[in-house]
């Protein structure tokens, strides 16, 4: 939060948390408190979901904003409360919104004739009904003289007797003090006291609220106020109120002042299976999670099945006292030969011969094991509780130290096991310990033969580390896999002298690719030429043969035109490549003329390539010479980054700029101006001699074609070009005029520009021509 800002108010319902209800579910008797962490602020709120307006007059119909002065109650229904905190200097906080589901409850009205004694009797009766033995609420409210020393604000009633004597012993029963470790300061005498006003403590605002508390809630509050945590290990305080030591770390814990419940006897405390809390087992439900404890008193592992004898013929389980099977009436095996399926698992084979039985499931485990391998229970400890061998106090099963005397009870498990094994093997142990309370099992152990023992070395380091041979094998596999991937990614077909033919088109393509690669490697000129153009997808491919040579022509789409020669080559191919693919006239119309172009010798081909390269170099040089500084500035002014200013264009033309100059893509300057929407520069360029019908590119479009392709954005350029007498009959490489392109776009405004220029008769004639062309297609 930034400095100087006002904290948002908090909307808090003043009630005891109800189990099974959310925080926003309250009733119409619940008080709502609003407060802000920023001091000296006023809180304004609304109950209809509107924004609080503190500057308007509050309480009127047009404004539903109220000023908070004391806790309020809400009507029943779904209420949306919005509150804002405002400081004295009109600094505002954020608006906090809370939605409450308010239920209807009849108001708790206490008649005047009901005195405090009747109410206290009802609450005391409810407390005894919930199983609590201890203090009486009547004496707590009568002893209100000492409330300052106890830091507890109790509700006072005006009809209490003045000068009533109080008993100091009853002050020890007060459980709801602010600190459980506070020592009450008892006053020596008691005198008369004046009538006091009603307290505003939220904990005792409604005396009838204590009647609504269930036994679980009261026991939960008692558990939270009675049991603290250890200051050393933060473990929960022992359930025994007379415990003086922590059962986890053995540190002394301070005693709790005041009267407490009597300590639970042995085997009365246990872990709840639902919440895993240490709770008394003599209650019907868990005091923490309210789960039933009747089913938890006898664990599943202690539910033993009766001994059965399995029939070898049909597999039916029979009682152990029967001699014949109840299903097939076959003879059952004797008890020595029978396969018993009971509650105990078969013991594991041991090397040392020492075993111990689990007190929960009965499984035999090794004597050095700490936990049972079948159910996980700690070995050597009864299922109920553990008893300290020194003082006889009861502790829970997982306790490491005794809560009464503080000795370590964890190590006594092993001592008891070792002693039981020593007594069973008739071997005296070198220690003498007091007899433990745990009952050890006397197991007859067979004496092992000392002559059969031998020392065997084992290795525990690097068990799962691969050997050197395995690592070398993996390296070879990785190398071979890389070689296979390289061969597959860069497949080079074998160079053969003669292709197979006879329909093996894949081998034919491999032959062409191999010889083309070899030819490019051996001829630097061809390699330089083939590396220049940027080619797209393959448009067409033709094969011609005349008995001596085979000519293969591949036509690719060119991505970008970066030089004059390539532009002209593409323009030339626009008229010839399609005809070559269709085989109907042109330069390659006949097979003989097509083959004659490729029937020259190798030296003639090299010389021709050299001449083409020289012509290309000269064309680039001429183009560089044409791009004078004035032309470059003119192209920049009408380009995408320029502004198309008429005064600058006229100045550049006066300085010697060519109005017919072309950029690096061979686009005329007037076409560049049209494509960049600088229609103001078109009349200036036309007046200075620019060719308005100059064609460019592979499609041979004019400036009017390019303006028509722009659509609605090029309508101003179209009007300007038509005003400068641009030819509408000029066709591009596809045989389309600018008017045809306008009809294809379907823009009525652009079409009307063409119609207004040439008249309605010309429009009808062009439309008729267009319809005939579509019918032919």
UniProtKB/Swiss-Prot annotation:
Pfam families: Ank_2 (PF12796), DZR (PF12773), Fn3_assoc (PF13287). GO terms for molecular function: zinc ion binding. InterPro entries: Ankyrin_rpt, Ankyrin_rpt-contain_sf, DZAN1, DZR, Fn3_assoc_repeat. It comes from the Eukaryota. The modification Phosphoserine is found at residue 201. Keywords: ANK repeat, Cell projection, Cytoplasm, Cytoskeleton, Metal-binding, Phosphoprotein, Repeat, Zinc, Zinc-finger. SUPFAM superfamilies: Ankyrin repeat. Residues 161-176 have a biased composition (Basic and acidic residues). GO terms for biological process: eye photoreceptor cell development. A zinc finger (DZANK-type) spans 230-289, 358-406. Residues 193-202 have a biased composition (Polar residues). It is found in: Cytoplasm, Cytoskeleton, Microtubule organizing center, Centrosome; Cytoplasm, Cytoskeleton, Cilium basal body. ANK repeats lie at residues 442-473, 477-506. Residues 161-202 are annotated as: Disordered. Gene3D superfamilies: Ankyrin repeat-containing domain (1.25.40.20). GO terms for cellular component: cell projection; centrosome; cytoplasm. Involved in vesicle transport in photoreceptor cells. Interacts with NINL. Associates with DYNC1H1 and multiple dynein intermediate and light chains as well as actin-binding proteins. This is Double zinc ribbon and ankyrin repeat-containing protein 1. It comes from Macaca fascicularis (Crab-eating macaque).
């Amino acid at each position: 939060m930034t400095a100087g800002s006002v904290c948002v108010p908090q909307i808090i319902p003043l009630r005891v948390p109800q189990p099974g209800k959310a925080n926003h579910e309250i009733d119409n008797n619940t008080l709502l408190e609003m407060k802000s962490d920023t001091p000296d602020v006023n809180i304004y709120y609304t109950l209809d979901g509107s924004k609080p307006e503190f500057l308007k007059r509050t309480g009127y119909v047009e404004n539903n904003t109220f000023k908070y002065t004391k806790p309020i109650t809400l009507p029943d229904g779904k209420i949306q409360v919005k509150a804002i905190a405002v400081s004295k200097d009109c600094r505002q906080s954020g608006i906090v919104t809370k939605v409450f589901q308010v239920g209807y409850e009849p108001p708790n009205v206490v008649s005047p004739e009901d005195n405090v004694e009747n109410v206290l009797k009802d609450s005391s009766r409810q407390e005894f009904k919930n199983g609590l033995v201890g203090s009486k609420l009547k004496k707590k409210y009568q002893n209100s003289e000492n409330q300052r020393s106890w830091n507890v604000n109790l509700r006072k009633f005006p009809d209490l007797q003045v000068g009533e004597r109080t008993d100091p012993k009853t002050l020890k029963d007060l459980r709801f003090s602010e600190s459980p470790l506070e020592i009450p300061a008892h006053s020596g005498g008691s005198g008369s006291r004046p009538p006091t006003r009603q307290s505003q403590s939220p904990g005792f605002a409604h005396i009838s609220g204590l009647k609504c508390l269930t036994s679980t809630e009261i026991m939960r509050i008692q558990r939270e106020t009675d049991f603290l945590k250890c200051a050393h290990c933060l473990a929960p305080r022992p359930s025994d109120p007379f415990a003086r030591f922590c059962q986890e770390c053995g540190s002394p814990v301070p005693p709790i002042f005041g009267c407490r419940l009597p300590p639970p006897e042995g085997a009365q405390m246990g872990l709840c299976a639902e919440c895993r809390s240490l709770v008394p087992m003599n209650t019907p439900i868990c005091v923490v999670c309210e789960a039933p404890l009747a089913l938890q008193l006898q664990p599943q592992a202690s539910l033993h099945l009766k001994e059965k004898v399995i029939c070898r013929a049909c597999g039916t389980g029979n009682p152990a006292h029967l001699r014949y099977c109840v299903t097939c009436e076959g003879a059952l095996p004797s008890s020595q030969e029978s396969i018993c399926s009971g509650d105990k698992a078969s013991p594991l084979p041991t090397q040392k011969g020492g075993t111990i039985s689990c007190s929960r499931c009965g499984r035999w485990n090794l004597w050095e094991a700490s936990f049972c391998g079948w159910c996980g229970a700690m070995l050597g400890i009864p299922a109920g509780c553990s008893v300290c061998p020194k003082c006889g106090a009861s502790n829970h099963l997982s306790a490491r130290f005794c809560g009464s005397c503080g000795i370590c009870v964890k190590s006594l498990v092993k001592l008891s096991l070792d002693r039981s094994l020593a007594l069973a093997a008739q071997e005296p142990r070198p220690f003498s310990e007091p007899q433990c309370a745990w009952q050890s099992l006397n197991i007859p152990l067979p004496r092992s033969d000392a002559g059969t023992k031998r020392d065997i070395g084992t290795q525990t380091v690097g068990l799962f580390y691969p050997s050197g041979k395995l690592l070398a094998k993996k390296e070879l596999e990785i190398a071979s896999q890389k070689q296979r991937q390289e061969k597959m990614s860069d497949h080079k077909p074998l160079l053969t002298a003669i292709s197979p033919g006879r329909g093996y088109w894949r081998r034919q393509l491999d032959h062409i690719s191999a010889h083309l690669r070899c030819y490019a490697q051996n001829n630097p000129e061809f390699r330089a030429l083939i590396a220049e153009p940027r080619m797209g997808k393959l448009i067409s491919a033709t094969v011609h043969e005349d008995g001596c040579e085979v000519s293969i022509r591949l036509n690719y789409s060119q991505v970008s035109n970066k030089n004059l020669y390539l532009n002209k080559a593409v323009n030339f191919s626009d008229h010839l490549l399609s005809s070559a693919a269709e085989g109907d006239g042109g330069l390659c119309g006949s097979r003989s003329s097509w083959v004659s172009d490729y029937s020259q010798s190798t030296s003639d081909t090299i010389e021709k390539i050299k001449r083409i390269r020289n012509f290309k170099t000269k064309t680039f040089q001429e183009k560089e010479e044409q791009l004078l500084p004035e032309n470059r500035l003119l192209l920049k002014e009408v380009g995408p980054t320029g502004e198309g200013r008429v005064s600058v264009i006229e100045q550049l033309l006066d300085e010697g700029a060519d109005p017919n100059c072309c950029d690096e893509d061979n686009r005329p300057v007037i076409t560049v101006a049209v494509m960049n929407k600088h229609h103001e520069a078109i009349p200036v360029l036309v007046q200075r001699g620019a060719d308005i019908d100059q064609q460019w590119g592979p499609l041979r479009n004019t400036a009017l074609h390019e303006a028509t392709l722009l659509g609605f954005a090029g309508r101003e350029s179209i009007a300007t070009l038509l005003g400068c007498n641009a030819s509408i009959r000029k066709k591009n490489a596809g045989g389309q005029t600018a008017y045809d392109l306008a009809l294809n776009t379907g823009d009525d405004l652009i079409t009307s520009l063409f119609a207004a220029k040439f008249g309605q008769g010309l429009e009808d004639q062009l439309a008729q021509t267009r319809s005939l062309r579509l019918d032919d297609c």
